[in-house]
Amino acid sequence: MHLLFALAVAALPSVLRMDDALRIFREGGFDLLIADAQVAAAQGDAAAAGAIANPQLSGSAGRSFGYDATACPGCSATAWSVGLTDPGALSDLLTGKRGLRLDVARAAVAAARLSRDDALRALSLQVRQALLDGALQQAQLDLAREIAESTDQTRALNQRRMQAGAISEAELARAEVAALEAQQGVDLAEQAVRAGRLQIAFLLGSREPAADFTVDPSLLDRPMPAEAPPLDALAREALERRPDLLAASAQESRAEAGLSLARRQRVPDVALSAQYQEEGSGQNALQPPTVTFGIQVPVPLFYQQQGEIGRAQAEIRAQRATVEKLRAQALVDVQSARAAVDANRRLVDRMRARLLERARRTRDLVQIQYEKGAASLLELLDAQRVWAQTRAEYLKDLHDFWLAVFQLDAAVGRS
């Protein structure tokens, strides 16, 4: 993905659906762009690890004083030399150190790519949760407006009754307080909706976040999916495809390659050189044409890479422990998410089966009774409170159910 394309501001649709949000996030989410840059950095490290050291070319020139170069044929007072040195490239290839460095770097690239996939998994869950929160906040705003409208109608009815002398001012005051409190709830719900939309826009990579869109309301109240597969099947899927676990395995491979490289570093690097020099060319020249070959080998007399080897061995142990920790964490995540899905499914089913309908029916009946004078204002307010509480609880149960579904997807490695 070209950087300019990735940085382009994605226009949010007027009604933001889940698929659209995930697509926009994958194209330009801030954290995903950072993860892409980390992969590119690892690829750069791999290119550097495979680099072959450049040979070194040297040359020098000088002049001898107090020497008569004309006294003999071929003599010269000018000295010059040229040399070529291999700082260890040939030795690097023959000893296999370059190949081992490449193994380490390639494993690091694989780990970076898998870490990017894991970032996509975790961040996709954040996007889904943010959209669920936005849908819940919109539904709560609709509920708050419904309550405000109902309480305002009750206030207006009581206003007419008091003018007719049918009720006292105290009862009207109660109705007015209920209406004002309901309007307070509307204002708070509107603020929550706006804040939630701004957070969604930020997560999706908007450079100038705005709240001029609506979250798809069907994200909450829609048919529930079929029962999840058995727990053992979900656990196997998580262990096979979770990118954080695969990335940890790649890091373990990188650590093992690093240990092999540390051990191979005990083989001394050999530097080769060749030099040609002359100061004159005759038999009496100060320095007749001379070719010199050299070799330089460090003698590992006092230090044989013990520190690097010990560090590499410790890193292998740490990476293996990390793999085991992530395996256990993956199984915990799967079991917790599956339990949450099942529990919230039962709550939603119970709400849909009877509880929600009975709370609404009770509110409607008491409303009719109050309008006919057969119920008190306190009974009406209590019925409205129970209905609002039940409806709000139902919306929260729906939110928690779908969040648990998305968490289960993330737990098994789906993004």
Predicted regions and their residues:
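A glycine-/polar-enriched beta->alpha junction
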Residues: 23-33, 40-55, 68, 83-104, ...
